[in-house]
């Protein structure tokens, strides 16, 4: 997102929200023109280990200005809350490239599996990817709900929970979500959510390891099969 500088030079700074995109490709936005990137550590960059936090990276002078703005002028990065999580933050960053690879394999598998059933998948299983998000066009409300219930049933946390559509604040339609995660709100852990409206797309992201995500995908397909919702079967 270009942001107009308040400096007299009227230079434009390029800022990128890098959530879901870290470690997906061989180069990060700062290597292709971005001046500043930011993201969450309960997404890609935290490797499924960090339980909170975020990061800002890029041009040193801009990072320094951010540090002054977010803490105290003159103190910057020398102060600020780490909440005793430094070990988790650094370990998560260390594991992040591998964990993102597992999430990408999970997305490719889900795309390939459900394209075999005749559903529209974006990206396609063999397409180049810029982030870990996978979408499925499931065509109707019943299929969306069954899919999310199947994903939840294979999750490591709250697998007994049965997701149902509800009026979530901030949305103008009901939403169904599957998120059996160790860290609330984590999207590097496998989750799925869908607004209950046309064109009835589910959005899937994450997967700490491919094997567990594969089981979740198969359980989602099984749930839909039991309800007679799978075409081409």
Set out the residue ranges of the language-model regions.
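Single conserved hydrophobic/aromatic residue that forms the stacking wall/gate
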Residues: 1-8, 12
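General beta-strand structural signal in soluble alpha/beta enzymes
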Residues: 14-18, 37-40, 123, 159-163
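Active-site C-terminal subdomain of aminotransferase-like
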Residues: 42-143, 216-233
